[in-house]
Swiss-Prot record:
UniProt-recorded name of the protein: Sodium/potassium-transporting ATPase subunit beta-1
Underlying gene: Atp1b1
Pfam families, alphabetized: Na_K-ATPase
InterPro entries the UniProt entry points to: Na/K_ATPase_sub_beta, Na/K_ATPase_sub_beta_sf
GO cellular component, one term: basolateral plasma membrane
Organism annotation: Rattus norvegicus
Quaternary structure, from the entry: The sodium/potassium-transporting ATPase is composed of a catalytic alpha subunit, an auxiliary non-catalytic beta subunit and an additional regulatory subunit. Interacts with catalytic subunit ATP12A. Interacts with regulatory subunit FXYD1. Interacts with regulatory subunit FXYD3. Interacts with NKAIN1, NKAIN2 and NKAIN4. Interacts with MLC1. Part of a complex containing MLC1, TRPV4, AQP4 and HEPACAM. Interacts with KIRREL3. Interacts with OBSCN (via protein kinase domain 1). Interacts with TRAF3 and TRAF6.
Entry domain remark: The C-terminal lobe folds into an immunoglobulin-like domain and mediates cell adhesion properties.
UniProt keywords, alphabetically: Cell adhesion, Cell membrane, Disulfide bond, Glutathionylation, Glycoprotein, Immunity, Innate immunity, Ion transport, Membrane, Phosphoprotein, Potassium, Potassium transport, Signal-anchor, Sodium, Sodium transport, Sodium/potassium transport, Transmembrane, Transmembrane helix, Transport
Extracellular face of the membrane: 63-304
């Protein structure tokens, strides 16, 4: 039995290294060299094919603009302050209850201060009244970075923070800032005047403004919203078109989206009110799957 065990032990040792045939794990040095060379060439070819296909694909893709945008959804509409549960609840006499909302607005509007828009090599004045979309050439590097339109904070009126650092929250008249999300090359198409059946009479129509309207989401909310004031360029309730199209972070790294400020001046107290804000346009779509596509809703409660 000891002899059988020794024979078995010698057998696997001989398989690992056979000194008579100069074999390691059953192969000679030449055999190992050939098989390793085969796998190096094989995987090298696979890597070459992979890298080649990636390079060909990259040649068809522009770093400045997506090649295919036919499935890009219309831009979303969002509000500042940005909050996780889309709920704004506060007491006007308790600064701590609305401090987070105010700080969120302050941080967002930092880049809209006059001091941040001084560089004439980057920024330009595009007028104080809405006008047509401002084309800035093709999406390429030939002209370098493109200028962006300045946006003045004082256009936001009571919600600019210039005269009221609490943005209305201290008085129980909260402000929200509305923006249209960025989409490369997107040019909003405002609706025709006659197509806006629900357009409030107080809102001035302008063919160069993408209008926005905020109302009570549900029937029971409509009577509780009270008066709504809008502050935007030229006194219009929407986004002026000269800020479009957007050319992307590489060509317009300092781009400023046009803003619309909305202030709710007499909300019913101690009541959770659901408010929907909606942009209107021929190329603005809405989706039940995405509640921020072209619109958003927010719950606001002013506690006594």
């Amino acid at each position: 039995m000891a002899r059988g065990k020794a024979k078995e032990e010698g057998s696997w040792k001989k398989f690992i290294w056979n000194s008579e045939k100069k074999e390691f794990l059953g192969r000679t040095g030449g055999s190992w060299f050939k098989i390793l060379l085969f796998y190096v060439i094989f995987y090298g070819c696979l890597a070459g094919i992979f890298i080649g296909t990636i390079q060909v694909m990259l040649l068809t893709i522009s770093e400045l603009k997506p090649t295919y945008q036919d499935r890009v959804a219309p831009p979303g509409l969002t509000q500042i302050p940005q909050i996780q549960k889309t709920e704004i609840s506060f007491r006007p006499n308790d600064p701590k209850s609305y401090e987070a909302y105010v700080l969120n607005i302050i941080r967002f509007l930092e880049k809209y201060k006059d001091s941040a828009q001084k560089d004439d090599m980057i920024f330009e004045d595009c007028g104080s009244m809405p006008s047509e979309p401002k084309e800035r050439g093709e999406f390429n590097h030939e002209r370098g970075e493109r200028k962006v339109c300045r946006f003045k904070l004082d256009w936001l009126g009571n919600c600019s923070g210039l005269n009221d650092e609490s943005y209305g929250y201290k008085e129980g008249k909260p402000c929200i800032i509305i923006k249209l999300n960025r989409v490369l090359g997107f040019k909003p198409k405002p609706p025709k005047n006659e197509s806006l059946e629900t357009y409030p009479l107080t809102m001035k129509y302008n063919p160069n403004v993408l209008p926005v309207q905020c109302t009570g989401k549900r029937d029971e909310d409509k009577d509780k919203v009270g008066n709504i004031e809008y502050f935007g360029m030229g006194g219009f309730y929407g986004f002026p078109l000269q800020y479009y199209p957007y050319y992307g972070k590489l060509l317009q790294p300092k781009y400023l989206q046009p803003l619309l400020a909305v202030q709710f001046t007499n909300l019913t107290l101690d009541t959770e009110i659901r408010i929907e804000c909606k942009a209107y346009g021929e190329n603005i779509g809405y989706s039940e799957k995405d509640r921020f596509q072209g619109r958003f809703d927010v719950k606001i409660e002013v506690k006594s």
